[in-house]
Amino acid sequence: MGEFGREYTDRNNQTPAELDYFYQENYGITRRKLNEDFLREVPTDARILEVGCNMGTQLLMLQEMGYSNLHGIEIQSYALERAKARLPRAELIQASALSIPHPDGYFDVVFTSGVLIHIAPSDLSRVMAEVHRCSNAWIWGFEYYSPKAAEIPYRGHAQLLWKTDFAKHYCEQFADVELVKEERLHYRNDHNVDSMFLLRRHKDRREARCR
């Protein structure tokens, strides 16, 4: 990622309180409240992995909420070192979303937050397969939403940002997942929409229900 990646990390150097303020201003609800609504069935000792944890702000918020078994992978060393300094009790390692270095079903929750939007369409199915493989129960996401896949120019660069219906992609790719909850979050100042979604894996595929 080089200098571009470092600039991304520096732009996203937020505290959980600052993140809550950002969400409140943009969506009219805090990130903490969304987390509480979506994770109410997830115990605080659940093993949770964030794929693409950057500086660890999402994990730090989960830690403040009482979650104690936190893990993260991040491909960029600059961001990872800062995440480790903020989260000394979490297990954070350098790795790619294309090849998560953990066993099948190792985590109770695997999640992304603003990460799938940066995965090239040609790699998206593979990344989703890795997320699905490592989760034994829950897949949680917060990503840009669009009913149709679309590329978005990103700070003067092409082929770096896309939006689509990521929850639907999971449902179409995996027969054993059920969409438990989704909230479409409309921006207060423009027409953009983001989506938070929670999917559950079922050992018996007959129990899985998606749209």
Per-segment meaning from a language model:
Residues 111:
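A conserved beta-strand element that flanks and buttresses the S-adenosyl-L-methionine
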Residues 1-101, 119-126, 133, 137-211:
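Class I (Rossmann-like) S-adenosyl-L-methionine-dependent methyltransferase catalytic domain
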Residues 114-118:
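Short catalytic micro-motifs in class I SAM-dependent methyltransferases
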